[in-house]
Structures are given as C-alpha cells and as structure tokens.
Amino acid sequence: LALPPGLSLAGVSDRAMKKAESVPFRGWYFDFVLLEKHRIKDSTPMTPVMPLIYALDVQLDRIFAEGLEARFARHEAMAKRFGSWAEANGMPVMAAPAYRSHTVCTVQNAKGWDISALNKFLTTKGMRIANGYGEWKDKTYRVATMGETQMSDIENLIAALEEYMKL
C-alpha cells in the first residue's frame, strides 16, 4: 500500500467472528468483536491515526487508477531489472528465481560495501537502500521495488551504484 507503519486492515469472515465471540480473553488489538461493535456505530474503540487513514484513501485512489495488474507488473519488472543488474555485477540475489519477491530485492553484499557509507553517498542523490536483518545485516542489502517506486528510480539507483563502484 506504500504507507508508513501504524495502520492495520483486516477482513473477518462470519465464521471467524462467531469463533471470536467464544474466546474469553481476546486481548485488545485483535478483539474483532469489539471492533465490529464500533464499526456498526461508525466509530472506533481507540483513537485512530487519522493521517494514515487519509494517506490510505489517497493510496487506494492511486492504486486503482494504475490498476492492480499494471502495478504488480511494474513491481515485478523493477525487481527483475535490479536483480539482473546485481547478478551481472557479481552480487547474487539471495532467493532462488522461483521464490523471489517482486516487492523487495535482497542482494548478497559480495562487494563488502559499508552500507552506512553507501547510504551517505546515495542520500546526496536523494535515495537510500537498507541493509539486511540480524546475522544478514552486513552480508546483504535490500532495494524496494514496490509502492510508488518507478523504473526510473531503479535506473537512477543503478547509475548511482555504478558511480559508487568507481570511487
């Protein structure tokens, strides 16, 4: 959806709602019964993050204007483009081709780049990448190929990375 974190959406079937009614300690966050009671009254059980709701409204307009199939195809094309470039430059994509995400490309940091230093360079060009998590923190880096990212953004990132490799 290309939104900041902090908003959850859920679809709950009649069967799941019936089951939720019989759960004695539903907690607060996932109490579908409480949420449904408030939904019927067009209210919420807690203060909602209104800027995110407005942002969701804008994003849904963008998504539907582009069309889901076109959006998914764009994400896939960007992921393939970046992955192909990375592999051609000796940096393997971490997942096997059949299992690769179309929304984020995770690449082995085979060049041994200091991702913090790389990001300092990239921010001068208005972009940044993310390193991996946990034990993969310095061994991988991630490039977003989703949301409002466009192929031109990927091409600009590739050009910047090629410039960085020459430094």
Indicate where each model-derived feature is located.
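Solvent-exposed alpha-helices and their adjacent loops that cap or buttress functional pockets
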Residues: 1-4, 97-98, 134-136
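A short linear hydrophobic-aromatic micro-motif
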Residues: 90-94, 128-132
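Short amphipathic alpha-helices in soluble, non-transmembrane regions
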Residues: 117-125, 157-162
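PLP-dependent enzyme catalytic core of the Aspartate aminotransferase-like
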Residues: 135, 139-167
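Active-site C-terminal subdomain of aminotransferase-like
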Residues: 1-84
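Conserved PLP-binding catalytic core of the aspartate aminotransferase-like
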Residues: 76, 92-122
